[in-house]
């Protein structure tokens, strides 16, 4: 029986998301943006709190006003931010999004020197993962060090302490030096995961064999077109 004190801790991306105010306008003609928060681990933590769960976020922000914006939002939503440290010398990440219905949603990531990519093994230890029932990990958090090792370490700690591990595939094509590296990394951790969550494209991305399988139109980084057989991809992973 799991006697852990808290419901869920989510680990990974956190950002300010700036959405176009001008629905239908080409990106270069946008006149203004509305500020929201983003990063699927952050959003999932917020959603869990709104459903009445006890949720924490394991991420990081920079020593900047954007980080203050995120912490304030999360605190107001009831998310435990004890494990969202400020990483000096880094920047809280940002995303800018256009909205051109029905099928054009360009997206630009600003993640150079991103704070949440600097979460390390020491941060994981301080998060006391054995105190939770569920750990949610994130694909993008495994694209570079030190968060890659921190994610694998967090997963090991969770499994040793009867904490269920959920993987949000979260394939963001331009965050990987090689599209195939996403699949190699995800497949390495999948055997330790209780539940994996992803779109059809993300499942296909996990089994990419050739970079030519991926096509990105109109800078839609969150919605690439990926060639492949979805049923075969599911069997492979």
Regions found by a protein language model. Give the residues of each.
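A short helix->loop->beta-strand "cap" motif at the edges of active sites that frequently abuts
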Residues: 157-164
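Hydrophobic beta-strand scaffold residues
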Residues: 55, 81, 165-167, 197
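Conserved phosphate/ATP/ADP-binding segment of small-molecule kinases
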Residues: 175-237
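N-terminal glycine-rich anion-binding loops that anchor highly charged ligand groups
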Residues: 16-20, 39-46
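Positively charged, low-complexity intrinsically disordered leader regions
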Residues: 1-26
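Conserved N-terminal subdomain of the carbohydrate kinase-like
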Residues: 54-139
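Alpha-helix C-terminal capping segments
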Residues: 43-54, 99
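Short pre-catalytic strand/loop immediately N-terminal to key active-site residues, enriched for Gly-Thr
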Residues: 28-38, 234
């Amino acid at each position: 029986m799991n006697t852990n004190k808290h419901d869920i801790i989510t680990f990974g991306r956190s950002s300010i998301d700036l959405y176009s105010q001008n629905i239908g306008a080409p990106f270069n003609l946008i006149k203004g943006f509305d500020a929201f928060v983003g990063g699927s681990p952050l959003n999932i933590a917020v959603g869990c709190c709104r459903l009445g769960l006890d949720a924490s976020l394991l991420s990081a922000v920079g020593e900047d006003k954007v980080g203050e914006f995120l912490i304030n939002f999360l605190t107001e939503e009831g998310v435990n931010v004890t494990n969202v440290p400020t990483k000096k010398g880094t920047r809280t990440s940002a995303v800018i999004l256009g909205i051109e219905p029905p099928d054009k949603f360009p997206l630009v990531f600003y993640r150079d020197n991103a704070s949440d990519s600097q979460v390390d093994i020491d941060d994981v230890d301080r998060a006391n993962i054995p105190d939770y029932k569920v750990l949610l990990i994130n694909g993008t958090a495994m694209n570079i060090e030190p968060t890659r090792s921190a994610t694998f370490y967090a997963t090991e700690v969770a499994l040793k302490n009867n904490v269920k591990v959920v993987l949000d595939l979260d394939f963001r094509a331009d965050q990987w030096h090689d599209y195939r590296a996403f699949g190699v990394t995800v497949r390495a951790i999948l055997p330790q995961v209780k539940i994996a969550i992803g779109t059809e494209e993300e499942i296909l991305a996990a089994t990419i064999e050739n970079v030519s399988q991926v096509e990105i139109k109109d800078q839609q980084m969150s919605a690439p077109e990926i060639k492949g057989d979805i049923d075969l991809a599911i069997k492979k992973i």
